[in-house]
Design a protein with these regions (language model features):
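Non-heme di-metal
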Residues: 1-250
Length: 250
């Protein structure tokens, strides 16, 4: 018999990422992404429109590519989220909260927005390298969600330097970028925990066992320690050298 923590409360279907909490963690991240991708796109567009530095054709082309790829990610996750919400209606409130938080970032000055865009990209790249190189966080079973995340991760690793290049020009203060990294980390970590728990509560309301989900959460936390250690090393590398590539690329 399939363990309870690997079966969805909705019809007993298996959770796509092996267990309940790992699946809901990535579902929560997906609900955050469309609003986050929109912030990244709008920030780079605003910086390019206002940039007073000499025109850089290569960077201009890279920003165009960044915007195209982030737009594709945004649309793909919006479709995934629509299917998630259809099966788990409580997830819609999570997506709306994420949109409100992202909209609040528009009130910040452009240098801080640029610094935050670079910080979010670097954090996403740290997660992406874990997805591409290890199977601690994401199962590699050929499922549609797994393929979606691996495609997204590969493109993030390929274009994260664009946001860093823009930050080097639009937010040249290293201390501002370090502050942005701390703020982005706190925002992302706290929201992932809150939204993952919100989705798990939806599962509990649909009949899942609270005790089984708690036990699964503990197992996931313990099993994720190697991944968290690798990402922490990358995070520290970025804090020391904000323009660097601590996620391991050459």
């Amino acid at each position: 018999m399939m363990p309870e923590a690997t079966r969805s409360a909705a019809g007993g279907r298996p959770y796509w990422n092996g267990t309940a909490v790992r699946s809901r963690l990535f579902d929560a991240l997906s609900l955050l992404l469309p609003a986050g991708e929109a912030f990244l796109i709008e920030t780079l567009q605003a910086w390019r429109a206002q940039a007073s530095t000499p025109h850089d054709d290569a960077l201009h082309d890279e920003i165009d590519r960044f915007i195209r790829e982030e737009g594709a990610h945004q649309r793909a996750h919006a479709r995934y989220n629509a299917a998630l919400i259809a099966g788990l209606p409580g997830a819609e409130a999570v997506a709306r909260r994420a949109e409100r938080v992202a909209a609040g970032l528009a009130d910040l000055g452009l240098p801080m927005q640029v610094a935050l865009a670079a910080a979010f990209e670097q954090l996403t790249a740290l997660v992406s390298r874990e997805i591409v190189e290890h199977d601690t966080l994401l199962v590699d079973d050929g499922s549609q969600p797994s393929r979606l995340w691996r495609w997204h991760a590969r493109e993030e690793l390929d274009h994260c330097d664009v946001a860093l290049a823009v930050a080097a020009r639009g937010a040249p203060s290293r201390w501002l970028r370090r502050l942005a990294l701390v703020l982005a980390t706190g925002y992302l970590a706290s929201d992932l925990v809150r939204y993952t728990w919100a989705l798990c509560r939806c599962d509990i309301a649909a009949g899942a066992s609270r005790r089984a989900l708690l036990a699964d959460g503990i197992r996931v936390m313990v099993g994720s320690l190697p991944a968290l250690a690798r990402m922490a090393r990358g995070w520290l590398g970025f804090a020391v050298s904000p323009q660097g590539r601590p996620h391991g690329q050459a």
